[in-house]
């Protein structure tokens, strides 16, 4: 990816009309199919693992794969460790659960967005904010999704996510990027 701002902007020429989420029938869901490889997990996967919400099919698929992870998903999860009230009786348990996930990641399987990815993600976030008339408080979430999506693209991965809305819009803006969705 280029670190040239003008070149990056030139690649993004979306219309000025609001993007529409496509119907589920037009999107890749992994309800009963094998997951593509290589696969990069979105934060929703870890959250759903912690809550025990994954289907048996998806559990089998996850057990079969050697996934990629992203430092952005790690930051989204570990943010909770600081956000939760340390005096609350359940905080220690949640922190241990999060630590058990991120400490398990092999360092050589963690993608870290580089400068070019950050630049492209910022541009995509701005475009989505403009086209979707997004609230300022949604910018951080959108930026994180764009960072994960573009990191996957840079490394030839497909994102696995439950977040259909945001990753569908990202795929519409950057058709070379790939995501596959699951339901809980």
Q: Where would I find each of the regions flagged by the language model?
A:
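Short, well-structured N-terminal submotif of metal-dependent ribonuclease cores
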Residues: 1-76, 80-99
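Acidic, PIN/NYN-like endoribonuclease modules and their adjacent C-terminal/linker elements
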Residues: 1-33, 149-184
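Active-site neighborhoods of divalent-metal-dependent phosphate/nucleic-acid chemistry enzymes
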Residues: 2-10, 18-19, 24, 79-84, ...
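Alpha-helix capping/helix-boundary segments
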Residues: 45-46, 117, 148, 165-167
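Conserved beta-strand scaffold positions in the cores of enzyme catalytic domains, especially
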Residues: 67, 110-111, 178-183
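Phosphate- and divalent-cation-binding pockets in alpha/beta enzyme and binding domains
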Residues: 76, 120, 169
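Short, hinge-like loop/turn segments at secondary-structure boundaries
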Residues: 85-89, 128-129, 177-179
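Short, flexible, basic/aromatic active-site loop/helix in glycosyltransferases
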Residues: 97-107
């Amino acid at each position: 990816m280029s670190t040239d701002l003008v070149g990056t902007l030139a690649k993004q020429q979306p219309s000025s009309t609001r993007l529409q989420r496509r119907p589920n029938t037009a999107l890749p869901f992994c309800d009963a199919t094998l997951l593509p490889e290589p696969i990069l997990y979105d934060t929703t996967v870890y959250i759903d693992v912690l809550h025990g919400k994954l289907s048996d099919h998806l559990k089998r698929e996850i057990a079969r794969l050697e996934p990629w992870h992203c430092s952005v998903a790690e930051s989204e999860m570990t943010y909770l460790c600081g956000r939760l009230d340390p005096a609350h009786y359940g905080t220690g348990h949640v922190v241990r659960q999060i630590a058990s996930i991120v400490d398990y990641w092999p360092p050589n399987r963690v993608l870290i967005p580089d400068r070019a990815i950050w630049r492209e993600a910022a541009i995509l976030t701005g475009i989505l904010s403009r086209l979707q008339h997004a609230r300022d408080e949604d910018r951080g979430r959108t930026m994180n999704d764009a960072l994960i999506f573009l990191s996957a693209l840079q490394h030839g991965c497909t994102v696995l996510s439950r977040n259909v809305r945001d990753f569908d819009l990202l795929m519409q803006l950057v058709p070379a990027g790939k995501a596959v969705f699951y339901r809980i």
